[in-house]
Amino acid sequence: MKLLLDIREESPDDIPAIREVNNRAFGRTQEASLVDALRSNGAVLLSLVAALDGQVVGHILYSPASIGDVGGSALGPMAVLPAHQRRGIGSKLVEAGNRYMKDAGWPFIIVLGHPHFYPSFGFKPASALGITCDWDVPDDVFMLLVVDEQKMQSVSGLAKYRDEFSSVT
């Protein structure tokens, strides 16, 4: 019997499960608290869940970000329950979320994440494009996906996340 995976926007009923997914995937509560804070402050561009036969097993969130005066989006957190990792669920969440961000017209997506995971979706080290991070993080974990080449042609400088992210770093 094949299990049915559904990628969809979060609903209010999903909030406890989203907290649980983030807490278990990261082994701490900061990411779940970040998601709650972004949601409470109206700073969620997109929040998707991956539901396996109705059970939420994964979550991804996009929030506003900026580089200079250019507005874009920040991916994160993205989490999958440990028992369901390495099955392509995270990849499906990233693909669906990035497609939505592109269709919505956001010119870039930044991410702080695993340097062996995100490049397969087109993310590159942001420093190669003259873009730096708000925080002191290793160069290879701060990445950028250019969605609109024309809007990003002469953009460089400091990428800014929402203030809510300061509680996580």
Predicted segment positions?
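Short amphipathic alpha-helix that is part of the acyltransferase structural core
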Residues: 1-34, 42-57, 142, 148-169
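Short, solvent-exposed loop/turn elements at beta->coil junctions and helix N-caps
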Residues: 35-39, 129-132
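Conserved acetyl-CoA-binding loop-helix of GNAT-fold acetyltransferases
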Residues: 80, 86-99, 111
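Conserved active-site alpha-helix within GNAT-family acetyltransferase domains
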Residues: 103-107, 112-138
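Conserved beta-strand in the GNAT
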Residues: 49, 55-65, 71-79
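Accessory recognition modules or surfaces
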Residues: 86-87, 91, 137-148
